[in-house]
């Protein structure tokens, strides 16, 4: 079993660079299946989700070379083979293979997606879109089969009943080579959607409106190879900014796009966090007295659900009472009892997280229950006096590139150990 050991209470300083966006790259890699030639992705993070996707792609017949943060993907040998379990089951983003395989072959058999257990995720929105485009859906054990019965996908007008990043991206991928025009209404607007649309357009797709709530895709016959730079990970950036405000003595977070973090930065401003926003970086000063705030997550450009948990340890340093309400994923509260184990005055009440501060945390054995809860526990461990042991760390390694090395470079006493 692997665990992370932190000896906390140390002031951190220095500079940390944000890696490429996890929530982009897990869609970009499957999207390359649509290309007729080599696609090169730059800025690919060193996370286990990428390792799993590379393994799956190679199993399907893709040839992949990896040079540091660059992936060179040759999808020409990809075969339409069933992918019922294994790596697929541990990976929520496996559902992007539905769209890419449907777009290339008109059929796909893929294991039901895994990932973090955060409550209902609207996979039905994906299926509704595929069915509108002419695909049928059936189930074979733990797998789902989508097929067009030899006919090409057809463009369609699709209204998303709920704003969903995954369903919006998956529909774009499937529609890129469909016959005719596809219009997605009530589309999600996240930067990662723009990133995937940019890749597809650079491959020859005709996609307009990404980043707005109406996206139009004119299907094309073929897509070619290209080179693409993955956008910076706004969630990783927010995580390090929150950490810097909680325990830093002057930390510069680089490779940041401020416009992707405006609602998050606005809440930090409300708390009284002192920071300087530069062209592609944010310098976070050592903080004094912070004020408790209340937060409600919402789809982009609102406060990101993925930043709710990483921000929680910083909130615990603030004076006063506050609350967190996650309207996107109702089960995103599993970090609360772990933080309480470290001495935090925090609890759940009617689906809402409530807290009082300031708090002095103490090191304790804790368990990461999902990716962002794990990030919260790492920050809490850095803040706490004494030793913190975090288990179930595979969740953390799914989404934070070189996290041990990055924190060590800032002066943290943190290590990954095998037992």
Curated annotation (Swiss-Prot):
Catalytic class of the enzyme: transferase
Domain of life according to the entry: Bacteria
Metabolic or biological pathway: Cell wall biogenesis; peptidoglycan biosynthesis
Entry-linked InterPro entries: Enolpyruvate_Tfrase_dom, Enolpyruvate_Tfrase_sf, MurA_subfamily, RNA3'P_cycl/enolpyr_Trfase_a/b, UDP_GlcNAc_COvinyl_MurA
Entry EC number(s): 2.5.1.7
Protein name in the entry: UDP-N-acetylglucosamine 1-carboxyvinyltransferase 1
Database matches in Pfam families: EPSP_synthase (PF00275)
BP-aspect Gene Ontology terms: cell division; cell wall organization; peptidoglycan biosynthetic process; regulation of cell shape; UDP-N-acetylgalactosamine biosynthetic process
GO cellular component: cytoplasm
Positions contributing to UDP-N-acetyl-alpha-D-glucosamine binding: 92, 121-125, 306, 328
Similarity field: Belongs to the EPSP synthase family. MurA subfamily.
Localization per Swiss-Prot or TrEMBL: Cytoplasm
Catalytic activity: phosphoenolpyruvate + UDP-N-acetyl-alpha-D-glucosamine = UDP-N-acetyl-3-O-(1-carboxyvinyl)-alpha-D-glucosamine + phosphate
Principal localisation: cytoplasm
């Amino acid at each position: 079993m692997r665990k992370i050991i932190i000896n906390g209470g140390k002031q951190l300083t220095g500079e940390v660079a944000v890696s490429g966006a996890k929530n982009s790259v897990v869609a970009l890699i499957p999207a390359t299946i649509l290309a007729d030639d080599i696609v090169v992705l730059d800025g690919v993070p060193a996370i286990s989700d990428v390792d799993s996707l590379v393994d799956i792609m190679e199993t399907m017949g893709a040839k992949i070379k990896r040079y540091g943060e660059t992936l060179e993907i040759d999808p020409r040998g990809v075969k339409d083979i069933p992918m019922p379990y294994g790596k697929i089951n541990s990976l929520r983003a496996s559902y992007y293979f539905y769209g890419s395989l449907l777009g290339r072959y008109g059929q796909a058999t893929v294991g039901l997606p895994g990932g973090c257990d955060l409550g209902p995720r609207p996979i039905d929105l994906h299926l509704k879109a595929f069915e509108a485009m002419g695909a049928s859906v059936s189930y074979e054990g733990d797998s789902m089969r989508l097929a067009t019965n030899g006919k090409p996908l057809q463009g369609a007008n699709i209204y998303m009943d709920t704003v969903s990043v995954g369903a919006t991206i998956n529909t774009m991928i499937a529609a890129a080579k469909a016959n005719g025009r596809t219009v997605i209404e009530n589309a999600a607007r996240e930067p990662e959607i723009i990133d995937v649309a940019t890749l597809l357009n650079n491959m020859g797709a005709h996609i307009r409106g990404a980043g707005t709530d109406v996206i139009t895709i004119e299907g094309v016959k073929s897509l070619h190879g290209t080179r693409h730079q993955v956008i910076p990970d706004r969630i990783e950036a927010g995580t390090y900014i929150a950490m810097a405000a909680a325990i830093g003595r002057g930390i510069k977070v680089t490779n940041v796009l401020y416009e992707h973090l405006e609602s998050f930065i606005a809440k930090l401003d409300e708390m009284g966090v002192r920071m300087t926003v530069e062209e592609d970086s944010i310098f976070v000063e050592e903080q004094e007295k912070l004020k408790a705030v209340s937060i409600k997550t919402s789809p982009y450009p609102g406060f990101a659900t993925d930043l709710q948990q990483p921000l929680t340890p910083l909130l615990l340093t603030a004076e006063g009472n506050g609350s967190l309400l996650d309207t996107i994923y109702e089960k995103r509260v599993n970090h609360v009892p772990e933080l309480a184990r470290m001495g935090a005055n925090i609890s759940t009440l009617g689906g809402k997280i409530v807290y009082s501060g300031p708090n002095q945390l103490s090191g304790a054995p804790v368990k990461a229950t999902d990716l962002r809860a794990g990030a919260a526990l790492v920050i809490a461990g850095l803040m706490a006096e004494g030793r913190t042991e975090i288990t179930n760390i595979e969740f953390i390694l799914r989404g934070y590139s070189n996290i041990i090395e990055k924190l060590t470079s800032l002066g943290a006493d943190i290590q990954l150990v095998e037992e």
